[in-house]
Amino acid sequence: MLKLTLPIAMEQFFRILVSSVDTMMLSSYSNDAVAAVGLVSQYSFFLVVLFSVIGTGCSIVLAQYLGAEKSETELNHIAQAGTIMVFAMSVFMTLLVIFGTNWLLNRYTLDPLVRKYAWQYFVIYGGICCFFQAFSLLQGAILRSYGYTSEAMIVSIIANLTNVLGNALSLYGWFGLPVLGVPGVAAASGLSMLVSCILFRVYIKRRKDVVFHLHGITKVPRDAFRMVLKVGVPTAGESLSYNVSQITIMAMISTLGTYAISAQVYTMTILRFVFVAAISIGQATQIKAGYFVGAKQNDIVYKKVFSYQLVATTCSMVMMVVVNLIKRPVIGIFTDIPEVFSFVSTLLIYSAYIEFGRSLNLIYVGALKGAGDVRFPVLYGIFSNWTFMVLGSYILGIKFGLGLVGFWLGIGTDETTRGIVMLLRWKSRRWQKHALVK
């Protein structure tokens, strides 16, 4: 488990570190730029999750196929089916982003400069560079399903360093280059995805046991698409619901002003370091659950998942204590605006509630999906997103006047109730009848 988890954790940590550096670099350029990029990052993340749906479907099916020792032909058909679906989806989303961004931004109450920056970033990164992002995510998911998490970590580090260098050139005008601002930052992010896409392909070619050939891609059997979609479509529903609910919450937060948006962005940037362990263990749990279920070793994986969750929760809670002890200098890295500083400081205290629930949620949902039990966590997740997170945040944050604290309480209630329900689902062992390999 450690062999899988550690590279994933390092990859996640480095990715979050670079994202934080991006935020700091943008904050030195303009607070309006931070608010703009933070706003459309909800949509950018939506694209990531949408493409990850196919990657997740391929990863879960491949993990169970590998555990069941399926043939190379069957393994390759799954990867090819994912490629076809990702290509079609990326073309559609590119057109949607380019022609629909103005309509999306009109749904928000934004200062003119914030709106301009948001449009520039999303059209370039979310639209023009969409194709590279899609295939990078798919290839990464396939490589990890074979257990090559170290290679995925190396690709992530190189791609993120490319992103940082591109940002520096765009914002600071090194070597006499013009300061490109937000468009340059978006282009740098797109370039990093291109680098990632190329490197993943190189690693897949080098690993002879990773079966992913494009030859004969037009002859993929329908069953391969069905297997991927059986897992991917329900996951898409959950992902769509979660991200639309996040966008809805951001729209409500935007009515509180630019300072509130900036505080939300900075707080989430800090929290990503907190849940890096939980999300890494959750991803590794999904892979391991797939292997064990495919090999029909249900009793072993049933017990192991509880220990995985205990480690994840402990890591998250220790990190929350550490972050709150050193939060003043940490927040000072991002902002010196008193109002924003105060917002972030308060939110970090309430974030312990969110992270406790998130640590449960990430592990048990990962285990259930790896076992093939996708529909239940999806349906309950949709219910919880809109009942506890959106409605709860609206009532507490807007109606009761608690502001950002009310939103944080709503989000925490969603994460915690979902985590407890998923724990009970795992204990019931109903997931055993949902294995993809019979």
Model-inferred region functions:
Residues 13, 17-35, 105-112, 169-180, ...:
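Helix-terminus/linker motif at the lipid-water interface of multi-pass membrane proteins
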Residues 21, 57, 95, 99-103, ...:
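Transmembrane alpha-helix boundary/anchor motif
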Residues 1-8, 62-129, 177-233, 289-354, ...:
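Short alpha-helical transmembrane segments in multi-pass integral membrane proteins
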Residues 1-24, 28-29, 45-57, 87-94, ...:
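N-terminal transmembrane alpha-helices
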Residues 3-22, 159, 192-196, 200, ...:
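Transmembrane helical elements of multi-pass membrane transporters/channels
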Residues 8, 12, 23-24, 60, ...:
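Transmembrane alpha-helix boundary and packing residues in multipass membrane permease domains
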Residues 55, 125-144, 152-163, 185-200, ...:
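Short runs within selected transmembrane alpha-helices of multi-pass transporters and secretion channels
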Residues 23, 34-95, 133-152, 250, ...:
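Small-residue-rich hydrophobic transmembrane alpha-helices
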